[in-house]
Amino acid sequence: MTKGTGGAGRSGGLDQAAVKTAYRRWAGVYDTGFGLVSRPGRRRAVALANRLPGERVLEVGVGTGLALPLYAPGKTVVGVDLSREMLLKARERVERERLTHVLGLFEMDAQAMAFADGSFDLAVAMFTASVVPDARALFAEMTRVVRPGGYLVFVNHFLAESGPRLWVERAMAPAARLLGWHPDFAREELADPAVAEPEIVEPCPPFGLFTLLAYRRPAAA
């Protein structure tokens, strides 16, 4: 399996300051740019979340709130994001579309969230894993705030294993700070396959560029 450059060894690696700077720049154009290409993956992730048991949903990396109108009646949603500018857009969407199922939107580091253990039935992270400085810390923190037996849902771009796309993604890696995400982010950087295996792995359009993953937190003994 092809591996990404990973963590501190990355060229042009992201830190919180770089993420905030990038999404301050992208906030005004995100919906009409990346928002369009990411729509199929976003819809599939929320459709899966809507089918999973439990009412309390945490959306990690809520961004401009593009997914918020898609949640089914009966789900309540709390969203977090590191970017104040993206959250402003999300709050405007909640008010404009009267999304009463959205209980709160908070500026928060997804790697160290201010929620008690087991606060949510499921956590959803769409196009977030390749943005945070430490994806393993993100995975661990999402696991912590989800109740035993609950689910973690991800949709994300992952590094190709071979072919021209792999070359392009590696060539783009030094631009991570400018882009606001890691083009060479490999799936094993999210979770150690020896420790956590997804129950669902589903390629998403366009052209299988994104992948939907679902992990179940083991039930309490």
Place the predicted regions along the sequence by residue.
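Conserved class I S-adenosyl-L-methionine
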Residues: T2-L52, L66-A67, K89, R93-E97, ...
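C-terminal alpha-helical "lid/dimerization" subdomain adjacent to the S-adenosyl-L-methionine
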Residues: G13, A17, F34-L36, V153-L212
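Short glycine-centered segments of the SAM/dcSAM-binding site in methyltransferase folds
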Residues: R56, T76, G149-Y151
